[in-house]
């Protein structure tokens, strides 16, 4: 009888320890996010369920082409601050120009094979600050991103993490890249 109580206690301790570990992982290392809107189409679709790696940029920096989640001062329909999912286009100290529907970084036209429509609206000429990034959606015609003064450049401190994986829809489960 005493052995069964000890056995049950050990099993419960394992379950509780596992639950605490999972809670810590979700709290400090990853965060789930659901895509809202079509601004990252065709790479991401509305209602895609994503996993964000919160540790990705604790020791390193975002690279051009990374898809990130960042905080903004924009408000959602329920009045909460809104986070956006966008692609890093410009890096700190880059000279970014958008003219005639094309994006230039440091006087070179950039190749963006992930775009379905390559036209990029806007008339922008900016030197990106040393602690900031220029982020845009892949669906440039509908994306509210760094081209918009309500969003602007993204300070590294505002970046929540890198999109590392899509969990839903199931037919598209896998890494994002």
Located regions from the model:
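Short, glycine/charged-enriched secondary-structure capping and boundary segments
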Residues: 65-66, 104, 148-151
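Mid-length scaffold segments of soluble, non-membrane domains
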Residues: 83-87, 91-108
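Solvent-exposed loop/turn segments at secondary-structure junctions
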Residues: 56-58, 74-76, 96, 103, ...
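Protein maturation boundaries and topogenic segments
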Residues: 1-83, 154-158, 162-177
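Acidic/glycine-rich C-terminal interaction modules and beta/coil loop segments
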Residues: 39, 114, 120-165, 170-173
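Residue-level recognition of short, solvent-exposed, well-ordered loop/turn junctions
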Residues: 45, 63-64, 91, 128-130, ...
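PP2C/PPM family metal-dependent serine/threonine protein phosphatase catalytic domain
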Residues: 101, 105-121
